[in-house]
Structures are given as structure tokens and as C-alpha cells.
Swiss-Prot record:
GO terms for molecular function: RNA binding; structural constituent of ribosome; tRNA binding. The lineage of its organism: Bacteria, Pseudomonadati, Pseudomonadota, Gammaproteobacteria, Enterobacterales. GO terms for biological process: cytoplasmic translation. Part of the 30S ribosomal subunit. Contacts 16S rRNA. Cross-links to the P site tRNA and weakly to the A site tRNA. It comes from Escherichia coli (strain K12). GO terms for cellular component: cytoplasm; cytosol; cytosolic small ribosomal subunit. This is Small ribosomal subunit protein uS9.
Length: 130
């Protein structure tokens, strides 16, 4: 691709994103589609842009992203995590600012498994006294 590109892997729930950053004019490509085409939901787009807006690099970098697995919010979170890691590789001085905003830490929450004898992970069947 480019001679001076930076890479970051992001994960969230069951999604994994590979993010490549290079100097450019703010173009974001996710799985060969634009950000607006890929995420119909405005909140997901905002989540993806958060780290770039924080460090004021929205118009300075081009992003090429591939993401697999999970749903919309999981993929958006994985992309945000990947962008954060790639930005830290690009400029280590951004780490403290990104850490304060909480983007550096991987959100380790996973779906709790369904248990035998229960309807869902914790939901019990209705109890009848008589």
C-alpha cells in the first residue's frame, strides 16, 4: 500500500478490526465501502470518528479498515480500538490523551453464556406457587 503507514488491531465483543493509517485527507474506507455506506447508524459513525476528533486528525489521515464478526456496535467499537492503537503507533505522544478518554483500554465485556435450566443467561423460568 503506502511506504509510511501505521497499523492497529482492535477488538470488541466478537468483532475484530484491522486498521491501516496513512497521511491523507480524511478518507475512511471500511471493507471497500465508505464510512457512510457501511454504517447506516449515526451513533456508529460517531464512535468510529471519536479518536480522530479527540486528537484533531480527521482531515489529516486516510484510513483503510477491514472488520469481521459481530454486529454494528461491536464492529464500531473494534474499529475505534484499532484506530486508537494505530494512532499510538503513528505518534506515541497521543497515548496519554487517548488513555484519558478511555479509548486505549480493550472493553473485555463478552456475552454471558446461557445456562442449562434457565431461559437465558440469568432469566429463570416463571415460578408458580400453586
Amino acid at each position: 500500500m503506502a511506504e509510511n503507514q501505521y497499523y492497529g488491531t482492535g477488538r470488541r465483543k466478537s468483532s475484530a478490526a484491522r486498521v491501516f493509517i496513512k497521511p491523507g485527507n480524511g478518507k475512511i474506507v471500511i471493507n471497500q465501502r465508505s464510512l457512510e455506506q457501511y454504517f447506516g447508524r449515526e451513533t456508529a459513525r460517531m464512535v468510529v470518528r471519536q479518536p480522530l476528533e479527540l486528537v484533531d486528525m480527521v482531515e489529516k489521515l486516510d484510513l483503510y479498515i477491514t472488520v469481521k464478526g459481530g454486529g454494528i456496535s461491536g464492529q464500531a467499537g473494534a474499529i475505534r480500538h484499532g484506530i486508537t492503537r494505530a494512532l499510538m503507533e503513528y505518534d506515541e505522544s497521543l497515548r496519554s490523551e487517548l488513555r484519558k478518554a478511555g479509548f486505549v483500554t480493550r472493553d473485555a465485556r463478552q456475552v454471558e453464556r446461557k445456562k442449562v435450566g434457565l431461559r437465558k443467561a440469568r432469566r429463570r423460568p416463571q415460578f408458580s406457587k400453586r
